[in-house]
Design a protein with these regions (language model features):
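Binding-site signature for planar aromatic cofactors or substrates
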Residues: 1-216
Length: 216
């Protein structure tokens, strides 16, 4: 039996930065761009990692970490297997939430919005850029499904790798891109005494963003 864990005394103070209203542009995507660039420049661990939460139509949630590949046209783009758990949930319920967490900068961005698939042409273009082994892996993995062993998946990988030696590896039909169109974006900056700076942008019907400071 697992032992109880008592973690009440584990805490740290956040004090390296602040965030004020005057720093924030009218368009939150400009701030996303600024914070992403700072995360890349300061070489934080996995700066493009984003936590994606999905849910079934009856509200049963699941969450995982994927890698952001682009922010284009105001949308957050990532790629996955359409038949994975998240792929099935997004097909049934397009409402998703995304979090970027950069411990080193004591920052988070929270995004809520709806997700759509990219076109086959867009998915093909990105798939062709992936390393050879990643393309092969995408073809042979029944993502999120039970498998008998590690050896099973490695045998499939070896077989498919030999099949495409010296040839172009085509994108499988069950793999491609997703784009999250945001309707809410929150910027969170850690502060001391847990009095964090939080600002929420909410998209309005006329296309402009309302901005509010939130209580920590």
């Amino acid at each position: 039996m697992a032992q109880d864990l008592h973690l009440e005394n584990i805490r740290r103070e956040y004090s390296s930065r602040s965030l004020s209203r005057k720093e924030l542009p009218d368009d939150p995507l400009e701030m996303v761009d600024q914070w992403l660039k700072e995360a890349l420049e300061t070489q934080v661990n996995e700066p493009t990692a984003m936590i994606v939460a999905t849910a079934t139509p009856d509200g049963r949630p699941s969450v995982r970490t994927v890698l952001l590949k682009e922010v284009v046209g105001g949308r957050f783009v990532f790629y996955s297997n359409y038949e994975s758990r998240k792929g099935r949930q997004m097909a049934e319920n397009p409402h998703v939430a995304v979090t970027f967490l950069w411990h080193e900068l004591e920052r988070q961005i929270h995004v809520e919005g709806t997700v759509t698939r990219l076109s086959p042409e867009e998915s093909d273009a990105y798939f062709a850029m992936r390393p050879y082994k990643s393309r092969v892996g995408a073809r042979i993995s029944p993502q999120s499904q039970p498998i008998p062993s590690r050896e099973y998946i490695m045998m499939r990988f070896a077989s498919e790798s030999l099949r495409f030696v010296g040839r172009e590896v085509p994108r499988p039909d069950n793999w491609g891109g997703y784009a999250v169109t945001p309707s809410r974006i929150e910027f969170w900056q850690g502060r001391d005494s847990r009095l964090h700076d939080r600002f929420l942008y909410e998209l309005q019907p006329d296309g402009h963003w309302d901005l509010h400071r939130l209580a920590p």
